[in-house]
């Protein structure tokens, strides 16, 4: 549904040029919720704004529903934009219009008749739970309600794609959850393809099917959300995940961690297991079969996109032989093992 | 005070109102589109024309820097061309309009400046044409600010119109100078000033009321 091919965006020229996006390829299938996560300044915003050409890419193609938007003239692009709803971090509602009239705006722009506007706006207000707020002005609404208005407005032109630019970043956690639920609901009911950018892992975890990680203008990693949460492929991915899960080894241990194994060290590992392995009595079996002692430092179970994910940080205490056998055994059970370092015994 | 005097005062008041209303309406009619043009042709804006914008901005600034009393005298030939005379209330309206247009334009531009850029972006994302952005987003969103600017303009026009009295423009300023100053009649002077004060208060209250009604923030 959305396809970016070799999209680059450069601001300025020469040695002071800023390469906001570097050769981005992205393919979001019909009906998917695709998240792009990254730190601020990584190019997320530029990326999503390139999809509806609010920013024109310096090079590359943007194809939405089979149409190459980068080749369209101004009029054709305006028509295409009716297919692309967009919501923003700061809602961008018109203060001078009531809730109803804000939602009606895209229809007015398309030249829809007054009676048809009423017919199309009312179900949207119903869908977003705003029917009783129709006559109010945005200033009278809470942040969550404003974003609901923005969502209703974005859906008014019956788009095929919804672009969400940090749509929940200005909202508190509870409101965020309700907005995410609404987006998921829309995705299911209307089959709408959603591309969202965010810096919040919570958003990715709650509703995304796939996630891309953007860093310094490059898409450095892309995976199904379940896989990303089990085993991020990049350092940045792991940093995001660990910060989100608050799954860091205790500070006192971190200070003692050594990068290489010695004759008297034992490994500290981060284990991630998903699906059926979560239910198995893994650690006690490991201790029994390989003869290592396992000291659990942190553990947590998360549910991501219907998949259960177990995460653990543990010290494997035993001789180098037994610990390496334990590691092999863990990997044989389809457990993602990351050795964080080694600590001296009896330290 | 004689009834002739009262009649004179009434006539002068109506003359002033006429000058202010006519010059206010015409300068709004021309100044608002000019202010919009100054805004939308800026670099990076929806109808960016950086060079034309620059020229327009300079012309506007020149218009604003000429003192009204000088402008009034300087454009007498132009005024005569338009209304056929260089004295009287109609003749005073011409320089008032010329002076107020750039004033209104800058105030409108300032009001448009207050609109969050995200709103224009949202409208663009909805597929709005530049004309639709102006009529459906910019003008309605800046309505309060524009009304505020027009109120300031009208109040300024009240005092400018009094200045127009100096060149035989009629109105309260004319009355105040001829009777109050030249004939040294402090009562007439006081009355004309009092009427001007009341007029300004009235326009300001009306303007404030309209701004409040337009504002949903």
From Swiss-Prot, chain A:
Q: Domain of life of the organism in this record?
A: Bacteria
Q: Which residues form the ABC transporter domain?
A: 2-241
Residues spanning the signal sequence: none
Instruction: Check the record and name the Gene3D superfamilies matching this protein.
Output: 3.30.70.260, P-loop containing nucleotide triphosphate hydrolases
Q: Which reaction does it catalyse?
A: L-methionine(out) + ATP + H2O = L-methionine(in) + ADP + phosphate + H(+); D-methionine(out) + ATP + H2O = D-methionine(in) + ADP + phosphate + H(+)
Bilayer topology annotation: Peripheral membrane protein
Q: Mind telling me which SMART domains this protein's record contains?
A: AAA, NIL
Q: Which InterPro entries match?
A: AAA+_ATPase (IPR003593), ABC_transporter-like_ATP-bd (IPR003439), ABC_transporter-like_CS (IPR017871), ACT-like_dom_sf (IPR045865), MetN_ABC (IPR041701), MetN_ABC_transporter-like (IPR050086), NIL_domain (IPR018449), P-loop_NTPase (IPR027417)
Q: Does the keyword Cell membrane apply?
A: yes
In terms of one coarse class, where is the protein primarily found?
Answer: membrane
Primary role: Part of the ABC transporter complex MetNIQ involved in methionine import. Responsible for energy coupling to the transport system.
Q: What is this protein's record name?
A: Methionine import ATP-binding protein MetN
Q: Which organism is it from?
A: Chromohalobacter salexigens (strain ATCC BAA-138 / DSM 3043 / CIP 106854 / NCIMB 13768 / 1H11)
Lineage of source species: Bacteria, Pseudomonadati, Pseudomonadota, Gammaproteobacteria, Oceanospirillales
Gene (UniProt): metN
């Amino acid at each position: 549904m959305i396809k970016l091919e070799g999209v680059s965006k450069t601001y300025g020229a020469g040695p002071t040029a800023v390469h906001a996006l570097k050769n981005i390829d992205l393919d979001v299938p019909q009906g998917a919720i695709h998240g792009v996560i990254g730190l601020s300044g990584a190019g997320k915003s530029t990326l999503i704004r390139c999809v509806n050409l609010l920013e024109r890419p310096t090079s590359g193609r943007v194809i939405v529903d089979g149409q190459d938007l980068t080749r369209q003239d101004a009029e054709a692009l305006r028509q295409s934009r009716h297919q692309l709803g967009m919501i923003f971090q700061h809602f961008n509602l018109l203060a001078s219009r009531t809730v109803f009239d804000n939602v009606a705006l895209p229809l007015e722009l398309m030249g829809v008749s007054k009676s048809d506007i009423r017919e199309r706006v009312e179900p949207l207000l119903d869908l977003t739970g705003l029917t009783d707020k129709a006559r109010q002005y945005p200033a009278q609404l809470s942040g969550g309600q404003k974003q609901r208005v923005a969502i209703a407005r974005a859906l008014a032109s019956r788009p095929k794609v919804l672009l969400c630019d940090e749509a929940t970043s200005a909202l508190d956690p509870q409101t965020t959850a309700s907005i995410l639920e609404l987006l998921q609901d829309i995705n299911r009911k209307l089959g709408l393809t959603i591309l969202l950018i965010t810096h919040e892992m919570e958003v990715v975890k709650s509703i995304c099917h796939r996630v891309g990680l953007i860093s310094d203008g490059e898409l450095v990693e892309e995976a199904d959300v379940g896989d990303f949460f089990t085993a991020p492929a990049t350092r940045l991915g792991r940093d995001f995940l660990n910060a989100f899960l608050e799954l860091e080894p205790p500070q006192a241990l971190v200070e003692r961690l050594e990068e290489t194994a010695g004759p008297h060290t034992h490994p500290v590992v981060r284990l991630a297991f998903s699906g059926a392995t979560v239910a198995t009595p893994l650690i006690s079996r490991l201790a029994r079969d390989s003869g290592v002692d396992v000291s659990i430092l942190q553990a947590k179970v998360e549910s991501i996109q219907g998949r259960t994910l177990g995460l653990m940080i543990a010290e494997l205490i035993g001789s180098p032989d037994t610990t390496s056998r334990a590691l092999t055994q863990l990997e044989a059970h389809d457990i993602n093992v990351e050795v964080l370092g080694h600590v001296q015994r009896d330290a | 005070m004689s009834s002739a005097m009262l009649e004179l005062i009434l006539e002068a008041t109506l003359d002033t109102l006429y000058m202010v209303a006519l010059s206010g309406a015409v300068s709004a009619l021309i100044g608002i589109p000019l202010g919009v043009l100054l805004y939308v042709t800026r670099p990076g804006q929806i109808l960016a024309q950086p060079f034309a914008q620059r020229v327009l901005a300079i012309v506007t600034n020149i218009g604003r820097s000429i003192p009204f009393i000088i402008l009034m005298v300087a454009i007498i030939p132009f005024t005569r061309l338009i209304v056929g005379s260089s004295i009287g209330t109609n003749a005073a309206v011409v320089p008032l309009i010329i002076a107020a247009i750039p004033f209104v334009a800058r105030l409108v531009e300032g009001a448009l400046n207050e609109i969050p850029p995200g709103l224009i972006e949202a409208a663009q994302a909805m597929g709005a044409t530049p004309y639709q952005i102006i009529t459906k987003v910019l003008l309605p969103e800046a309505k309060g600010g524009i009304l505020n600017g027009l109120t300031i303009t009208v109040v300024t026009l009240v005092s400018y119109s009094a200045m127009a009295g100096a060149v035989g423009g009629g109105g309260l300023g004319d009355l105040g100078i001829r009777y109050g100053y030249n004939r040294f009649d402090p009562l007439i002077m006081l009355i004309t000033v009092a009427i001007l004060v009341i007029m300004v208060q009235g326009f300001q209250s009306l303007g404030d009321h309209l701004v409040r009604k337009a504002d949903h923030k």
